[in-house]
Design a protein with these regions (language model features):
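Amphipathic alpha-helical segments of tetratricopeptide repeats
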Residues: 357, 390-391, 427, 460-461, ...
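Short amphipathic alpha-helical recognition elements used for nucleic-acid or partner binding
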Residues: 28-60
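Catalytic-center loop of serine/cysteine hydrolases
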Residues: 151-166, 195-209, 213-350, 359, ...
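DNA-binding patch around the recognition helix
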Residues: 2-10, 31, 43-48, 65-125
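Conserved alpha-helical positions within TPR/SEL1-like repeat arrays
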Residues: 333, 367-371, 437-441, 474-475, ...
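A structural micro-motif at secondary-structure boundaries
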Residues: 3-4, 15-37, 107, 111-115, ...
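Structural motif corresponding to the intra-repeat A-B loop/turn of tetratricopeptide repeats
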Residues: 342, 376, 412, 446, ...
C-alpha cells in the first residue's frame, strides 16, 4: 500500500518541515526556538494575509496572559533567523496598528516532488536518498535522517544506511566537573550547574558529542581520579576507554567576595584523551547572578580552540530559554541531580521537588524528579512527572525535547511510540551509543527482541570504544534471556570481561547481577551465589545501597532454593533495612513479601499471613503489579495449606490477571503451577492437569529449566491420582537426578516424596523404603516446613508398608500434632488418612471405620474432595461384619 507523502512549505531559499519542526536554508538547519517556529508556521499558513497581533498571541499562548513584548521578541528572533530586520523586511512585514503579514509567496510541496528551489547539491543528495529508499522498500514515517554535515531530507531503512555508509563519529567531550576553591559547601552546587550548562552549550549545533552526566558520574566512581585541575596521561587513557571520550574538560571555580559584586571565576583545562595532553587553558570571569554568560564565554573560547563554529545568536536565545528561570531553581536542580548520581534518590527527590516548586515550568527538573521516583519504586509518580516534563519541553532544543518525550513514552509505557522517538534520535545522531541502547531497550520491552538484536548488531559496528561497550552485551543478554539462557550467560560474561578491561566496575557489577539471575534460573545455585556476592561488593564500594539490597535479595533467593531458610531470612532482613534507609517503598514491599515467604516455609502460617497482608497494600501504593503477582503465588500456597482452597484459586486468578497484563510469563508459570494444587486436592484432576501443562509449556517457552522440572514433578504427583504410577515413578526419578545436580534440596525432597508415593501405588514397598533411607541426610537438613511435612507423611507410609507400623504410627502422630500447632490443615487430613491406613493394615478396621466416615465428611465440607474420596473408598473396602 502506498504511503502518504510528507508535506513541506518552501519560500525563497528556505524549506519548512512541519512534522520535524525544522526550518532549512538549502540543506542547513536554521535554529529556531519552538515559539518562533510556531509563529513562522502561523504566518506561512496565512501567507499574504494580515494576522492580527491578538490572534497571534492567542494561538501562541492559549492558556496564558502574556505581554505584547513576548510576541515582539518572537518576531525579532524569527527575522534574525531569516536574515532580515524590521527596517529591511522581505518576509515578515509589520502592518502598523494591525499585526504581521508574511510577504513572500509560499509553495506547498510533497517529498515526492522535485522542488525547483532546491540547489544542485541538494538535488544530488535527493537522488542518492531516493535510490537507497527504493532498495529498502519502505519509508519511516515522521523521521528525518541526519548525517553529520549532510541533511538528506528523506526517510529510508536504517540498516541500509549503515551498510552503505557508516556514520561519521563526532569528537566526544566529557565535562568532568569543577573543583570548588571557595571552601564553602554552600557553593558546591555550582560544579554540577556549570557542568550541565557547559555541556548544553557545547552540544548546541551538534558538532560535538557530549558524554552524559550519568556516565561521567559513574566513571568518577570507578576510576581513581585525583582532585586536580588536570589529569595524568595514564588517567586520560583510562577515561578514553571507560567513557569513550576524545576530550575532557576539567578545572575549578571560585566565587569572589561580595566586594567584587558576587562574581565567579572559572578556570578550564581542555585535555585530549587520545594524545594524552592538554590542548587549551581557559579562564573566564562573570556574574554569579548570570551563570549563563560565564558559560557562554567559556564555551565560545573552547569552541574556538576546537575549531568549532560559534553558537549563533538564535541558538544562544534557545539555550538560555532551556535553563531554569531563577538561581534558586538552578541550585536545587543541580543539588538534586548530584544526589541522584550518587545513589541518594530520597534526598535527590526532596531537592528536585523543591526545584519544581521554585520553577514549575522547568522541564528538566520534572524529568529528573521522574527518575528519582523510579529509583524509589513509585512508577505511577514517575510517569506523572515524565508527562509533565514532556508537556513543558517546548523551550528545549530538539534533541533534548526528543529525549524527554522518549522517557515519557517509555515509562507510560507506550513502547511502540518510544521506539519511534528513540529511532528518531538514533537516526539523527547515529554515533550516539546512548540513543541506540535506548532504542534496543524499547524494542526489547515491546516484545521485539529480533529488532533489538538488529539494532545492537549495528551498534557493534561503531568504532571502539563505542562498538565494544559492555552495555551492548548486557542489552543482548536481556533480548535473548527468555529464549536462550546459555547465550545470555555468555553475553553477560563477555560484558563483565569488557568492563574489567576498561575499569568500568559498575558495569561489571551490572553484568554480574544479570549473570547471577541467569544462574539462579538455570538452577546453578552454587555458581550463582559468589557471582551475586561479587556484584554486591562492587555496589557497596561505590555507595550504591540499592544495588547492595538487590543482591542481598538475589543471594537470599538462592539460599531458599538450597533449603537454607535461616540464612535466607537473615539476608532478607538485611535487604529490608537497606531499602528502608533508601526510602524505597517498592523494595520494602518486596522484602516483606520475601520475609513472609520465609516465615511461611518455617511453619508460622499466622505470622506469614500478616506479612503478606502488610506487603500487598505497599505494592498497590507503588502500583507494582508484577511484585504483587509474585506475592500472590506464595499467598495461594499458604491458603492451600490451610485448606482454604477456593480462596487459593481466587488468589491465583488475581495473580494471573496481573501477570497477563504485563505479559510476565515467568510469574504466570508459577501461578498456574500453584493453581493446580488446590484443584487436585478438590478432586478436579482434569482441570488440574490442564493448568499444570500450561505451566510447563510456559516454562519451556522461556527456557526455565529449573521451574520446568518442578512442573513435571507436579504432573507426576497428579499421574499417581490418575492411576499412572509407573509414569510418575519415571518422572520423579529423572527429576531427583536433575534437582540433586542443581543443589536444589527442597525440590529434591519433593520429588522423593512423590517417588515414594508412586512406588507405594505400584506395590514396591521395599523400593519405597530404600528411597527413604537414601534421602535421610537431605530430609534431616530440610528447613522448608510444607515440603518437610509432605515428605514425612510419605516416608511414614513407606515405613508402614515395610512392616514398621508402630514406628510409622508414632511418626504420624507427631506430625499431626505439629500440623495442628502450626495450622497446616490440609496436611492434617492427609496424616489422618495415613494413620487410618495403618490401623487397617494392623487389622483394626472396625476401630477405624468411624474415623474414616468422619474424615470423609469433614474433608468434603472443607472442599478436599480427593481426600474425601480416598477416605470413603478405604471405608467401603472394610468388610461389614454379619
Amino acid at each position: 500500500m502506498a504511503m502518504e507523502n510528507k508535506r513541506f512549505y518552501e519560500f525563497g531559499p528556505f524549506r519548512i518541515d512541519p512534522e520535524e519542526h525544522q526550518l532549512l536554508r538549502g540543506e542547513e538547519p536554521v535554529p529556531l526556538t519552538p515559539k518562533a517556529f510556531e509563529t513562522l508556521m502561523i504566518l506561512v499558513r496565512s501567507s499574504e494575509r494580515v494576522v492580527p497581533k491578538d490572534d497571534l498571541m492567542k494561538s501562541l499562548w492559549p492558556d496564558s496572559f502574556v505581554e505584547e513584548a513576548n510576541l515582539s521578541q518572537n518576531i525579532f528572533i524569527l527575522r534574525k533567523a531569516l536574515g532580515e530586520t524590521a527596517q529591511n523586511a522581505r518576509y515578515v512585514m509589520t502592518v502598523p496598528g494591525r499585526g504581521y503579514r508574511f510577504a513572500q509567496k509560499v509553495r506547498e510541496v510533497s517529498d515526492g516532488e522535485a522542488s525547483l528551489l532546491v540547489q544542485s547539491q541538494s538535488i544530488h543528495t535527493v537522488t542518492i536518498a531516493e535510490k537507497r529508499r527504493s532498495r529498502s522498500g519502505f519509508l519511516w514515517a515522521g523521521l528525518a535522517v541526519l548525517a553529520v554535515g549532510c541533511w538528506v531530507g528523506y526517510q529510508f531503512n536504517l540498516r541500509r544506511i549503515h551498510a552503505a555508509a557508516p556514520p561519521v563519529v563526532r569528537r566526544s567531550v566529557a565535562v568532568l566537573g569543577f573543583r570548588n576553591l571557595t571552601g564553602r559547601p554552600e557553593e558546591s552546587w555550582l560544579s554540577t550547574a556549570l557542568s550541565e550548562m557547559l555541556s548544553t552549550e557545547l552540544a548546541t549545533g551538534n558538532k560535538l558529542r557530549l558524554v552524559s552526566g550519568e556516565d561521567v558520574a559513574r566513571s568518577k566512581l570507578e576510576l581513581p581520579l585525583t582532585d586536580a585541575d588536570s589529569l595524568s596521561r595514564d588517567t586520560l587513557a583510562r577515561l578514553h576507554t571507560n567513557l569513550g571520550s576524545d576530550l575532557i574538560v576539567i578545572g575549578s571555580y571560585t566565587v569572589l567576595d561580595e566586594k567584587s559584586g558576587g562574581r565567579v571565576r572559572l578556570d578550564l583545562h581542555l585535555q585530549d584523551t587520545v594524545a594524552q595532553e592538554t590542548i587549551a587553558d581557559v579562564a573566564v570571569v562573570g556574574s554569579e547572578a548570570d551563570l549563563f554568560e560565564v558559560v557562554t564565554q567559556a564555551g565560545s573560547r573552547l569552541r574556538e580552540k576546537l575549531g568549532v563554529e560559534a553558537v549563533s545568536e538564535v541558538e544562544e536565545v534557545s539555550v538560555r530559554a532551556s535553563l531554569p528561570s531563577n538561581r534558586e531553581a538552578a541550585r536545587l536542580y543541580s543539588e538534586g541531580l548530584a544526589r541522584l548520581r550518587r545513589y541518594e534518590a530520597l534526598e535527590g527527590r526532596e531537592l528536585l521537588e523543591q526545584s519544581v516548586a521554585a520553577d514549575p515550568k522547568y522541564a528538566l527538573s520534572h524529568a529528573a524528579l521522574s527518575a528519582a521516583w523510579t529509583a524509589l519504586g513509585y512508577d505511577a509518580k514517575a510517569r506523572a512527572e515524565a508527562a509533565k516534563a514532556y508537556a513543558l519541553s517546548g523551550n528545549l532544543s530538539r534533541e533534548e525535547r526528543l529525549v524527554v518525550e522518549g522517557n515519557d513514552r517509555f515509562v507510560t509505557p507506550d513502547y511502540e511510540k518510544a521506539i519511534e522517538i528513540y529511532r528518531a534520535l538514533y537516526t539523527l545522531f547515529p554515533d550516539n551509543l546512548e540513543y541506540g541502547l535506548d532504542l534496543a531497550k524499547a524494542q526489547d520491552f515491546a516484545g521485539r527482541p529480533s529488532d533489538a538484536l538488529s539494532t545492537l548488531a549495528t551498534l557493534q559496528k561503531l568504532p571502539a570504544p563505542l562498538g565494544t561497550d559492555p552495555r551492548i552485551d548486557l542489552r543482548i543478554s536481556s533480548a535473548i534471556s527468555d529464549s536462550d539462557h546459555a547465550k545470555a550467560l555468555a553475553a553477560e560474561e563477555q560484558a563483565a570481561q569488557k568492563g574489567l578491561a576498561s575499569g568500568s566496575k559498575l558495569l561489571v557489577a551490572r553484568a554480574r547481577r544479570s549473570e547471577c539471575a541467569t544462574l539462579n534460573n538455570l538452577g546453578r545455585l552454587n555458581e550463582a551465589i559468589p557471582v551475586c556476592e561479587e556484584a554486591m561488593h562492587i555496589y557497596a564500594a561505590a555507595g550504591d545501597h540499592e544495588g547492595v539490597a538487590t543482591e542481598l535479595n538475589d543471594i537470599a533467593y538462592a539460599r531458599v532454593q538450597q533449603g537454607n531458610l535461616t540464612e535466607a531470612k537473615k539476608l532478607f532482613e538485611e535487604a529490608a533495612q537497606n531499602f528502608r534507609e533508601l526510602g524505597n517503598d517498592d523494595g520494602v514491599a518486596s522484602t516483606l513479601a520475601n520475609l513472609a515467604g520465609i516465615v511461611y516455609l518455617d511453619g508460622n502460617l499466622a505470622e506469614a499471613k500478616k506479612l503478606f497482608d502488610e506487603a500487598i497494600p505497599r505494592y498497590r501504593k507503588v502500583e507494582d503489579s508484577e511484585g504483587e503477582a509474585l506475592l500472590l503465588v506464595n499467598l495461594a500456597a499458604l491458603q492451600t495449606d490451610r485448606a482454604e482452597l477456593r480462596a487459593a484459586e481466587h488468589t491465583c486468578q488475581q495473580g494471573l490477571a496481573l501477570a497477563q497484563r504485563t505479559n510476565d510469563k515467568h510469574t504466570q508459570g508459577y501461578l498456574l503451577a500453584e493453581l493446580g494444587d488446590p484443584l487436585m486436592r478438590e478432586g478436579k484432576l482434569a482441570e488440574s492437569r490442564k493448568v499444570y501443562e500450561q505451566s510447563l509449556a510456559l516454562r519451556n517457552e522461556v527456557s526455565e529449566k529449573q521451574t520446568a522440572a518442578e512442573s513435571r514433578i507436579y504432573l507426576a504427583e497428579l499421574a499417581i491420582e490418575e492411576g499412572h504410577a509407573a509414569d510418575a515413578e519415571k518422572s520423579a526419578r529423572d527429576a531427583m537426578v536433575e534437582f540433586r545436580g542443581g543443589q536444589q534440596a527442597d525440590d529434591e525432597l519433593t520429588a522423593a516424596a512423590i517417588l515414594i508415593e508412586a512406588l507405594l501405588a505400584e506395590g514396591k514397598a521395599s523400593d519405597a523404603k530404600d528411597t527413604v533411607d537414601r534421602e535421610a541426610d537431605v530430609a534431616s537438613k530440610n528447613q522448608n516446613r510444607p515440603i518437610g511435612l509432605k515428605y514425612a507423611i510419605a516416608a511414614a507410609r513407606a515405613l508402614a508398608a515395610s512392616g514398621k507400623m508402630t514406628e510409622a504410627k508414632s511418626r504420624l502422630e507427631s506430625i499431626l500434632a505439629e500440623e495442628k500447632k502450626t495450622g497446616f490443615q490440609a496436611y492434617q487430613f492427609e496424616t489422618r488418612l495415613a494413620l487410618a491406613e495403618i490401623e487397617v493394615r494392623a487389622g483394626h478396621a472396625d476401630a477405624v471405620r468411624a474415623e474414616l466416615v468422619s474424615l470423609a465428611r469433614q474433608a468434603q465440607s472443607r472442599g478436599l474432595g480427593l481426600i474425601a474420596r480416598k477416605a470413603a473408598e478405604m471405608q467401603r473396602r472394610i468388610p461389614v461384619k454379619t
